[in-house]
């Protein structure tokens, strides 16, 4: 597997992956996190234009997609029922999804993102047990709860370099 920055030529593949992910989430007890329309096409296109959309390829085929940036995420400013592991600059991952054809694609993407910054934050819905399991296996620590821009709560995770 390899990671590269997404281009607009990847849009059809990305849309298929997100459609698969929404269906998978709904069938695994998490129908509300992304509903039937998230992420919207204009958000995906914006991520691509800004250089923050990444794809994971296997045998020259796009199998996963995610948002990665080294930035302060406004929704991570306030954390409830806990604390972040540190106050150092961090990378963030959002909107990670795979097409389900290659086992471990999400873990590969998250490991790549961590290798870029060594201090990574991510959040997920309380019903997204699959992602919670992936994050636990990769030694992300549950830090508390954050609120998204629409006010819904998410479980906040962080992984920091052990040095």
Label each region the model flagged.
Residues 116-127:
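Conserved GNAT acetyl-CoA-binding A-motif
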Residues 22-42:
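Conserved GNAT-fold acetyl-CoA-binding loop/helix
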């Amino acid at each position: 597997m390899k990671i590269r920055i997404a281009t607009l030529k990847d849009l059809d593949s990305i849309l298929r992956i997100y459609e698969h992910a929404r269906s998978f989430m709904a069938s695994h007890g998490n129908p509300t996190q992304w509903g039937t329309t998230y992420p919207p096409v204009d958000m995906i296109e914006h991520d691509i234009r800004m250089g923050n959309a990444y794809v994971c390829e296997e045998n020259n085929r796009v199998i996963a997609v995610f948002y990665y940036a080294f930035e302060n995420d406004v929704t991570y400013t306030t954390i409830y029922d806990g604390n972040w592991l540190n106050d150092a600059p961090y990378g963030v991952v959002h909107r990670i999804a795979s097409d389900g054809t290659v086992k471990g694609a999400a873990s590969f993407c998250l490991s790549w993102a961590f290798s870029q910054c060594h201090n990574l934050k991510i959040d997920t819905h309380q019903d997204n047990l699959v992602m919670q399991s992936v994050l636990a296996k990769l030694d992300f620590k549950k830090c508390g709860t954050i609120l998204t821009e629409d006010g819904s709560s998410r479980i906040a995770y962080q992984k920091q370099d052990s040095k």
